[in-house]
Amino acid sequence: MNNHIEALSYYLGAFVDELTRLNVCDVVISPGSRSTPIALLMEQHEGMNTYLHVDERSAGFFALGIAKAKKRPVALLCTSGTAAANYYPAVCEAFHSRVPLIVLTADRPHELRDVGAPQAMNQINLYGTFVKQFTEMALPEASEAMYHYARMTTQRMIASACLAPQGPVHLNFPVREPLIPDFSLESLWDKGRGEYTGVVQQGNAVMPSEYVDSLVGRLSHMEKGLIICGDDSHSEIATFATQLAEKTGYPILADPLSNIRSGHHDKTMVIDCYDTFLRNELLKETWKPDVLIRFGGMPVSKALTQFIKKQTKAVHIVVDESGQWRDPALVATEVVQASDIAFCSALIEKMPVMKKNDWFRMWQHINEKTKETLREMETYDTAFEGRVITDIVRVLPEGATLFASNSMPIRDTDSFFFTSDKNIQVMANRGVNGIDGIISTALGASMICDPLVLVIGDLSFYHDLNGLLAAKLHELNITIVVVNNDGGGIFSFLPQYEKKEHFESLFGTPIGLDYEHVVTMYGGSFSRVNGWEQFREEVQKGATTEGLHVVEICTNRDENLTLHRKLWAKTQDVITTSLQGESK
């Protein structure tokens, strides 16, 4: 028995210690029995920050939010059985949004598998192709070789999570009873520790000089170009993309998640209203770029995606550090395996300065005309969902974070988050674009990003109510704006809306819930606003005070659709008139 406890303590102690040596210092733990030894050792280690979250599905997204904000791997720990299965949605999102998670699942030992033992199921490769790597850890043994193995496996798995493209990894730990480690053991954290840690260093891929020279030569003869920046671009992409735009004269179509629309950098070349004006048929037929250079994930805008698809004669360059073929438009002619920064730097160094021509001025002019028209919605007294975004940005302080939920909030952010000199970070879960786990992801991010305001629809809010527990347990500061249109507002914009007979029951899905009591249960404050002045006051108050604050604004789905269509129609008229004037 003593030999088992000693092996358990030293073996798992070496694993936990190696996590901290590799700067994985945050772990989200859901309570359970089989994970007891790892949980206790993590709580005991002075280098580890532990966060309890009872619901595993919410816990997974909470860890995802911390990792997204810190841009470092975060660990997740749960017991065996369906607890591990509840991590699946967050693991899928982490994989597709390239967020490093270290998923740790406890398991029954091999003799208790496939024999009907309680709380035992097949956890081998549980997450399938949605993790970069899986390993089944060996059972604890008391030997220097096994302590070294525990550390080396930790190093290998963290390296896998952190190398481009980043993503989740899964370690499955079979353990036998008894499960309580012995903290009185001498040198508990030192077993198997070498002088150095095995860290894989990844440098920026060097751009081949021959390719750079060839590309510079081609671009020098292409006056009509576009730079498109999507989600998960490099944090310094704003500086380098704007320099490249200045050199080439190509406008930057900046997705809100690229974080190029706001900040202290020069935004002369930044186009922010393309989602609206690229709906114009005349413009789509007459504006034909020679080349498109894209960084990051595919932008939110469907209008932009459709525009890209139509450019069948253009050169399409997709820059991706991992070399993955991320081209849902199916038009890429070149995929360059390099970091955004390495690519931009190489071109900036060798590109001659190309004068701003009519091409850039056309985009800039139409962008300003569109923005002028869209800003008319700031005069609407009606609870228009697009104005939610502009009014939040108006009162957010410098350095704040806006987290946009999926469905309508991220689309309204795309349409109505205009360029700003304030430094406001925009975040979202755009890996697989689900509405689950949004509250939990935002709460995880709020541990690093303060103040943080989440904009979320009522159905997405309902979907992750359990996530609010983290705000109470860990005393987090967050303001949640619930846009309550009593249902799935995005479906009003889709063809399903025309099927009136079954629309409300299958797509509109009103649930008629009063969230005030739920928010109070989790220790938060709740306000239901009437009017835009009160809305701005409540958001501003929430962003400058501690705790959980939920601000509900009630909207009407049909009215919201009508107002969106009214704005779009007016902008199309303005754009068409402007284009026809230019052609005369």
UniProtKB/Swiss-Prot annotation:
Gene Ontology molecular function: 2-succinyl-5-enolpyruvyl-6-hydroxy-3-cyclohexene-1-carboxylic-acid synthase activity; magnesium ion binding; manganese ion binding; thiamine pyrophosphate binding
GO biological process, one term: menaquinone biosynthetic process
Keywords linked to the UniProt accession: Magnesium, Manganese, Menaquinone biosynthesis, Metal-binding, Thiamine pyrophosphate, Transferase
Record-listed E.C. numbers: 2.2.1.9
Pathway: Quinol/quinone metabolism; 1,4-dihydroxy-2-naphthoate biosynthesis; 1,4-dihydroxy-2-naphthoate from chorismate: step 2/7; Quinol/quinone metabolism; menaquinone biosynthesis
Domain of life: Bacteria
The UniProt record lists the keyword Iron: no
Classification via InterPro entries: DHS-like_NAD/FAD-binding_dom, MenaQ_synth_MenD, MenD_middle, THDP-binding, Thiamin_PyroP_enz_TPP-bd_dom, TPP_enzyme_TPP-bd
Reactions accelerated catalytically: isochorismate + 2-oxoglutarate + H(+) = 5-enolpyruvoyl-6-hydroxy-2-succinyl-cyclohex-3-ene-1-carboxylate + CO2
Function: Catalyzes the thiamine diphosphate-dependent decarboxylation of 2-oxoglutarate and the subsequent addition of the resulting succinic semialdehyde-thiamine pyrophosphate anion to isochorismate to yield 2-succinyl-5-enolpyruvyl-6-hydroxy-3-cyclohexene-1-carboxylate (SEPHCHC).
PANTHER family: 2-SUCCINYL-5-ENOLPYRUVYL-6-HYDROXY-3-CYCLOHEXENE-1-CARBOXYLATE SYNTHASE, PROTEIN PHYLLO, CHLOROPLASTIC
Record text on subunit structure and interactions: Homodimer.
Similarity comment: Belongs to the TPP enzyme family. MenD subfamily.
Protein name: 2-succinyl-5-enolpyruvyl-6-hydroxy-3-cyclohexene-1-carboxylate synthase
Lineage: Bacteria, Bacillati, Bacillota, Bacilli, Bacillales
